[in-house]
Amino acid sequence: MKFMAENRLTLTKGTAKDIIERFYTRHGIETLEGFDGMFVTQTLEQEDFDEVKILTVWKSKQAFTDWLKSDVFKAAHKHVRSKNEDESSPIINNKVITYDIGYSYMK
């Protein structure tokens, strides 16, 4: 069964565009076995903060778990972690939610 992981970022108002632009350059996730795709979305009409969701689609939950343990993951997130600890980080909060994909259709 296919698997999806959502990383929901709550951001300082006005910073979503900069966060989304970071994804324009791939950092190796696309090379991993089991990776099927990614969507980076911005929730519309948030008044007090910005919200960005990073949705990754995998062939299986195991493929996602393998990515979390990979050097590719560590390299792509090493600067994110240090910025989160910095008070100037635009990231207020994040939450990871996972899903089994029961059905999908894309044209």
UniProtKB/Swiss-Prot annotation:
Binding site residues for Fe cation: 7
Reactions mediated catalytically: heme b + 5 AH2 + 4 O2 + 2 H(+) = delta-staphylobilin + Fe(2+) + formaldehyde + 5 A + 4 H2O; heme b + 5 AH2 + 4 O2 + 2 H(+) = beta-staphylobilin + Fe(2+) + formaldehyde + 5 A + 4 H2O
More about this protein: IsdG seems to carry out oxygenation of the heme without the assistance of any of the prosthetic groups or cofactors normally associated with activation of molecular oxygen.
Pfam families, per database record: ABM (PF03992)
Domain of life: Bacteria
Cellular localisation: Cytoplasm
Transmembrane segments: none
Any one Gene Ontology molecular-function term assigned to this protein's record: heme oxygenase (decyclizing) activity
Phenotypic consequence of residue 77 to A: Loss of activity
Function: Allows bacterial pathogens to use the host heme as an iron source. Catalyzes the oxidative degradation of the heme macrocyclic porphyrin ring to the oxo-bilirubin chromophore staphylobilin (a mixture of the linear tetrapyrroles 5-oxo-delta-bilirubin and 15-oxo-beta-bilirubin) in the presence of a suitable electron donor such as ascorbate or NADPH--cytochrome P450 reductase, with subsequent release of free iron.
Annotated site location: Transition state stabilizer: 67
Family under the similarity heading: Belongs to the antibiotic biosynthesis monooxygenase family. Heme-degrading monooxygenase IsdG subfamily.
NCBIfam families: PRK13312.1 (NF009837)
GO cellular component: cytoplasm
Organism: Staphylococcus aureus (strain MW2)
InterPro entries documented for this protein: ABM_dom, Dimeric_a/b-barrel, Heme-degrading_MO, IsdG
Chain sites annotated for binding heme: 22-29, 77
Name assigned to this protein: Heme oxygenase (staphylobilin-producing) 1
Self-association and partners: Homodimer.
